């Protein structure tokens, strides 16, 4: 290929051709007006296609109100919690329920910060411009994650309902919080490396790292509020459709002697409405997050494997892979996945 700069540049005569061609086609002008006024995505919407797209599904899970990650990178956390809340709602017959996403967000920030500083200690001999050290420093406490990270957090810290630890401005819109935290973590990394180069031993460096984690906790607590150690939980089970029906005498629980006499029935189904909510209640006082998870969530988060479809020549299918330096909870280990063909991936989603 030629290295002549003039041959590689955008030429003025071509620009004139481009603009002439653009203005010759009226469709381009209409599209430009629409995109400039409404935005590219709205302007590009095919409304005939929208009307033709079916909104009925062969598999549909009813799981309460819609959750919203807003302007944060917690998609993996919301998806994982929604998996558990579906099972919890059905197990305990609840109309709606939502876990606290902020609770896991707090501990994820703490754990990622700790793991980052540990990785810094593991790579003190790496050059600062090495690919490994650059990868470690890319986003020390960024929001992203996947199932194994979620499972590691739940195993260690449990879960709480949203009422016990609601959303905050910095969980809904995490950019400023994480930008500041990442900046401080990189400052800490630079000082650890400076102390190491000056001859500091492991004990001194670990003492310094523990002090830094105290600062990290303060940043997280100021930004998100402290997570609860214990909390109270109250919920009512939902009304069953059958409860609204009058007794017909065929139910085994019917207490009337004369099954043909509806007035003689003393079943709960025929009691007059009092206006008092008599649905069964779930009440917990001073329960811990781990106790809540073990008692009320009918799912073991460790009973899952991560599947991926990465059609790369260097990564053959049907093998398990581990990604170095990818842990959020350091003692839980790095992330692993099984690389499978797309048809296996689809079947797993349906099954």
Task: List each model region and its residues.
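Catalytic cores of glycan-processing enzymes that make or break glycosidic bonds
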Residues: 73
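Structured alpha-helical subdomains that flank or immediately precede key functional sites
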Residues: 1-69, 77-351
């Amino acid at each position: 290929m030629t290295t002549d700069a003039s041959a590689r540049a955008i030429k003025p005569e071509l620009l004139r051709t481009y603009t002439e061609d653009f203005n010759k086609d009226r469709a381009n002008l209409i599209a430009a007006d629409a995109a400039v006024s409404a935005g590219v995505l709205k302007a590009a919407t095919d409304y005939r296609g929208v009307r033709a797209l079916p909104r009925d599904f062969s598999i549909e899970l009813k799981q309460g109100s819609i959750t919203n990650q807003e302007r944060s990178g917690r998609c993996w956390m919301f998806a994982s919690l929604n998996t558990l809340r579906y099972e919890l709602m059905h197990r305990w017959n609840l109309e709606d329920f939502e876990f606290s996403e902020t609770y896991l967000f707090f501990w994820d920030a703490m754990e990622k910060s700790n793991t980052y500083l540990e990785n810094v200690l593991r790579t003190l001999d790496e050059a600062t411009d090495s690919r490994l050290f650059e990868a470690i420093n890319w986003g020390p406490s960024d929001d992203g994650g996947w199932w194994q990270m979620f499972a590691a957090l739940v195993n260690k810290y449990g879960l709480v309902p949203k009422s016990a630890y609601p959303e905050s401005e910095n969980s809904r819109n995490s950019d400023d919080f994480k930008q500041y935290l990442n900046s401080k973590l990189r400052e800490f990394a630079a000082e650890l490396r400076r102390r190491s180069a000056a001859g500091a031993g492991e004990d001194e460096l670990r003492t310094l790292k523990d002090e830094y984690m105290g600062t990290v906790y303060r940043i997280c607590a100021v930004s998100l509020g402290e997570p609860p150690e214990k909390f109270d939980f109250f919920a009512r089970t939902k009304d069953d459709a059958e409860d609204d029906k009058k007794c017909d005498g065929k139910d085994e629980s019917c207490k009337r002697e004369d099954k043909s006499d509806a007035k003689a029935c003393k079943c709960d189904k025929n009691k007059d409405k009092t206006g008092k909510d008599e649905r069964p209640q779930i009440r917990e006082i001073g329960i811990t997050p781990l106790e809540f998870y073990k008692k009320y969530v009918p799912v073991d988060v460790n009973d899952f494997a991560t599947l991926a479809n990465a059609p790369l020549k260097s990564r053959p299918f049907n093998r398990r892979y581990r990604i170095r330096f990818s842990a959020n909870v350091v003692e839980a280990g790095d992330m692993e996945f099984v690389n499978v063909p797309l048809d296996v991936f689809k079947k797993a989603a349906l099954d």
